Amino acid sequence: TDVYTRRTESQSDWLLSRLAMYWKSHATEVYVKGEVFDHAGGEKAPAPTVRYTGTRGTAATHGRPKLEDIVPYDDNEDGNVTFCNNALEGRPLESVHPSKTGRNIENLNCEILGIARDAAFLYWMTGEEKYAKLAAGVFDTYMTGIYYRKVPVDLNHGHQQTLVGLTSFEVIHEDALHIVVPLYDFLYNYLKSNYPDKMIIYAGALKKWADNIIANGVPHNNWDLLQARYVMNVGLVLEDNKEYTDGKGREYYIDYVMNRSSIRQWSLTRLADYGFDINTGIWAECPGYSSVVINDYANFVNQFDTNLQYDLVKAMPILSKAVATTPEYLFPNRMICGFGDTHPG
């Protein structure tokens, strides 16, 4: 972190200028065709907006350069990015359409946001303003860019429209949001003192993110819990409902996670009633999806207890049975069977 802090001290925009943004076009609309990025456009926002990633999958002909090799403020009239051609010796930099880059655009932004988050943590720990300046520059640029960006439109008018996030093709892979939330939390007092007029923008960006995760996704399986985790984390760093003109603050989003259901986002209680067998505690998906679900519920138990002093196990007694049933997935050699996305680790 200190390496980038020193660079930022000598050139204030060194790190933030390497974010993947629509620096020149300020595009507000993003258009995809199924699982592939097509183009960006729409009205010009008052500030640079966040670039959308290339594809739903990870396959890419062009990879992102090292951070120091990223072209600052990289944006041309064709909407291309300057990335490395993986097929050529030396991986030379080329201007390439984002659809050739897999998920590297969002990953680049996550790397930069991660550096900013670590700097925010160091500021919170030490009080040294140099860390706050680095973190705030990146955070302000990125979150303002999220605030003015709209949810992507699928030109194929297909199922993908119900899955897209603001930065990723799946709402369950809005990885940047997992980084932004603690960044905001650690940096909150500094932002409130130095960016007071932007606090409503930051909250608006977080709420837009959460609202889209609620609106999209899959409600009746493991996706729902992954979505709920994002929404819960946003709720915990917002102010009370009364602080926002739309009445949507901390209580609103936490209540949505616990008690409310919509077409693509079920409450924790409704999902548990639907997914766990009342007699055995077995989850209605194959392993390892089932083990992931139990782990996520256990994390929610801890989160509710730590932050809200609320006993989720008392509210959902089936969780005790589900945890106790977990060893039943093991073979005698302590291995488990797995289907789908199950990973050996």
Locate each region found by the language model.
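Extracellular polysaccharide-recognition and catalytic grooves
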Residues: 200-345
